[in-house]
UniProtKB/Swiss-Prot annotation:
Function: Dioxygenase; part of the gene cluster that mediates the biosynthesis of penifulvin A, a potent insecticidal sesquiterpene that features a [5.5.5.6]dioxafenestrane ring. The first step of the pathway is performed by the sesquiterpene cyclase peniA that generates the angular triquinane scaffold silphinene via cyclization of the linear farnesyl pyrophosphate (FPP). The cytochrome P450 monooxygenase peniB and the flavin-dependent monooxygenase peniC then catalyze a series of oxidation reactions to transform silphinene into penifulvin A.
Record bears the keyword Transferase: no
Name recorded for this polypeptide: Dioxygenase peniD
Top EC category: oxidoreductase
Sequence similarity: Belongs to the PhyH family.
InterPro entries: Phytyl_CoA_dOase-like
PANTHER family membership: PHYTANOYL-COA DIOXYGENASE DOMAIN CONTAINING 1 (PTHR20883), PHYTANOYL-COA DIOXYGENASE FAMILY PROTEIN (PTHR20883:SF45)
Natural source organism: Penicillium patulum (Penicillium griseofulvum)
Lineage: Eukaryota, Fungi, Dikarya, Ascomycota, Pezizomycotina
Amino acid sequence: MTVTAQPEFGLHSVDATAPVEEITKVMKHHGGVIVRGLVSEEVLQQVGREIKPFFKRGNHEGPFCERTRTVCSIPRKSRTFVEKIFGNPVYTAVCDELLTAHHEAWVGGQYFKFASPPVYNSSVAFSTLPGNSQQALHRDDMDHHGKRPACDVGQYPIGRDSIVTLFVADSRTTKQNGATRWIPGSHLQHHLGKPDLSKEVHIELERGDAFIMLASCYHAASENLSDTDERIVYSAFTINSTYRQSENVFLSLPLECLREFSPWMQKRLGFSASSPLCGWIDLTDPREVLNLPEPSDLERYH
């Protein structure tokens, strides 16, 4: 496949009241977009009360520097995070447009069309302290073995990406205190295309701002070169429901916690089957087996 020269890529921002179509248009062209003021001060304060005490345990989970503290398995720790950040209506609508799985099939002589909305993939809260080292540039869809040919920006197809990432700033993030480095346009590369360091930009955010990004983009945390700044960012990841979730939420979230959420959120967390019947228990809707309200939204072929 011959790929023509790409137009200029860069970092763009929109207001949280912007139409979803405008947000996804920028994302398909550049790979990501800043959404100013996506999360309110009231929500941030409540999420902080629920999550920040876990930072004090000093956990350094996963492939991060020892000056990075993380909180994982957030659905069982912060209901507000799940409902107001992961479940933010702008982020939800963006994910629905970019990640809903569609399929068509013949069963005998009858033709069917199926659609499965995306679900929760994972979440991590990050606290990066002064002295935090630079993270290597990477793509978030590595876990799912994302393979893609290069493509022209005008030809970006829905379904090319398996995950949409959300970063929400709890504190002001700057180049000095470790703001995320990102390479705009890298979502259009071949999956084995190397990151071009000359094109990286820093995602500088004010408290309550968010960055929504396609998981095929190269990005990484930067060094925290400040003397005193703690950079706190909340991240949420939503995935095409035909893929395996990175976080095993079925083991990390107790059923008694799950029941506190609305039926819609339970399904969004992955506690449902997808059309026509993927994720069953004994060939039965798992919500029926778990005695959860409202059945899965299935388009059955039998």
